[in-house]
């Protein structure tokens, strides 16, 4: 994967207060990508409000990070027999946050910014038609308490309804993630937060940020491969994920977790 992408052009990915994450070529400044995270969509009309100058709004305010990930990671133990037949699926993923513009994070596949077509099984080209393949995960939402939540009760498939309810509960521990990515001391182009864990799976490890609904500090382990599930570790007191933060709130309420350093 590294050899195949050795000549890949350099890219700059920056959040903008126009509501988008932009991707520009480092050599010419040519825009290759513009993505509007789901969490900022409801307040985009504020950009043209006559009174905007009197009430500044934040949109895509977080600092993105990138890393190379095997999307098939964890599917087979390297020590198991037959591992020589294992076929990895390497991609370069970008993890972005909204910072003060909203809560949560999103994940994009930015493997090949020069591709115009994408054969089956390869990295998607940067086109609107490939949006569903480029966006691996979008777990962003606005910062207001009045923002509508998914109507899980209207779902008729039991599994989908359960997943919807679980996602709502998980989101209560995700706040404004404002911390800058933690960089590798030996390679400033690499974030240590996107990493392979000891279970052979790939994940991004983040603090949950501030002003979450549950108001407690939580370590987020968002898997980037396979089913992309979210694991949470409450970082203080005797709490577990299932503990009601309003009951056992020792050193918890009005709190949050910044960016962790993975060792």
What are the language-model segments listed below?
Residues 1-263:
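A fold-level detector for beta-propeller and closely related beta-sheet-rich head/sensor domains
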